[in-house]
Amino acid sequence: EGYLKPIKITKKVSLGAGEKKVVELTSEDFPSLLIKNPYLWYPNGYGEQYLHHIKLSYNAGGKVSDAKEFDFGIREVEVGLNRVEVGGDKAEVEYGRVYYVNGKRVFCKGGWIQPDILLEESDKRIYDEARLMAEANINLIGSEDMPSPSETWFESFDKYGLMWWHVFYQCYRMTPGTETENNPLDHNLAIVCVEDMMLRYRNHPSIISWVGVNEVLMNENLYRLTKEKVKSLDTTRIYIPTTSYHWDVDALTPYLKEDLPTGTTDDGAPDYNWAPSSYFFDKVREVYLQMFRNELGMPSVPMYNSLRKFIPTAESTANVNSPIFPLDSICLLYTSPSPRDTERSR
């Protein structure tokens, strides 16, 4: 067990009637806030989930006027893009999103789950769900729409090391090239919602990415407003505008190109039903690597050592025209560290 001695700091603030003011407590003003060699928060399977506690209060006239306390974790999230060329002279290039937490490359395994809406979930049930997912060696959960989970939801994810990426807008309500492409119509209200979500949730270490929308895209005005808002409120996490796109970007959303490649996809059928093995071999040929697939369905990818044990050709050169494809080094690209990251940022 680790223990940090309590740190107490005080800052005088003048606030007029009806006035709003942002008050910052920084290590430049308070050196004791600079913690050396802190106990870190890690994803499930990569280390401990150390959490620390903070109490904030605003005192006026010798009495507490407002107060808030919460747990937080200390961790660093970096991202990269794994670039791979596949297929002979006219090689196609695929990019897979890579996450590093506290310098460790994380093999993301998980799926989608939505917090129940308008249902009264007990705290015990929420914690039990998180615990069962952690025991299944899951470490990343994503939302498909714009959920507003309870604090208990995120506290359970913080406790069990479940990473989460948070989606701002509703899936398939703003499809480029259709009558819904300008939804939502009230962009100011949409941005207020984004700001509220970020301010409410951003202290949770389990959140590793902010995502604009799942599988579709907002129009250019809302796209830029959202991007600017995220940048102004959080510089510690990557922002991904969409998890996947299936339309003509040049014709319909050329503004998306400044954020490509996103490194995520769910191109093609999500494979929720049973199919003969030949179907999956053909699917890999059609859409190539899909190194970071945000929606997959039933199949799952084993760990690196397991792949090497039951696929003897797993270290052969990747080639879509080979009779053993995809039972070659493509199998290992999902799980093995690569020096070919074309992007790595904090």
Question: What is the predicted function of each stretch?
Answer:
Residues 334-341:
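Conserved small/polar residues in nucleotide/adenosyl-binding loops
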Residues 1-144, 148, 159-160:
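Secreted/periplasmic carbohydrate-active enzymes, especially glycoside hydrolases
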Residues 140-332:
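Substrate-binding/catalytic cleft of secreted carbohydrate-active enzymes
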Residues 15, 278-279, 339:
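Compositionally biased regions
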